[in-house]
């Protein structure tokens, strides 16, 4: 993995040391997983469920994304998704709109950051 990508991810909020421990130091595997994550079908499915207020489906997709973002060490996005999962788990649906907006904003920020490194 290029030093530029490591630097950008660190600035984004990824603890590269801990994350690489999860990937047993395999930077190529991490980069591959990160690339696959960006095209994960859970994002459009979550958006569709949100637009139709299908809370059970939202929970399932958000929970999946919480696990993936956690494993990839994408802490800012993980925190946003985790907050939404918590609200959905406890049926605090009045909080979902604001939390979904935070998730979308954090995902957009991550995509901008990764765009600077040439990852897509």
Which residue ranges define each predicted feature?
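Two-component system phosphorelay core
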Residues: 1-120
């Amino acid at each position: 993995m290029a030093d530029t990508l490591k630097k950008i991810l660190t600035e984004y909020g990824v603890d590269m040391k801990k994350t690489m421990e999860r990937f047993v130091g395999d930077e190529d595997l991490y980069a591959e997983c990160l690339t696959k994550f960006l095209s994960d079908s859970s994002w459009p499915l979550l958006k569709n469920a949100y637009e139709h207020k299908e809370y059970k489906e939202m929970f399932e997709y958000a929970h999946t994304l919480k696990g993936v973002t956690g494993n990839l060490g994408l802490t800012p996005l993980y925190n946003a998704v985790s907050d939404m999962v918590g609200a959905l788990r406890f049926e605090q649906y009045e909080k979902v709109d604001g939390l979904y907006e935070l998730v979308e904003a954090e995902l957009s920020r991550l995509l901008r950051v990764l765009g600077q490194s040439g990852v897509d």
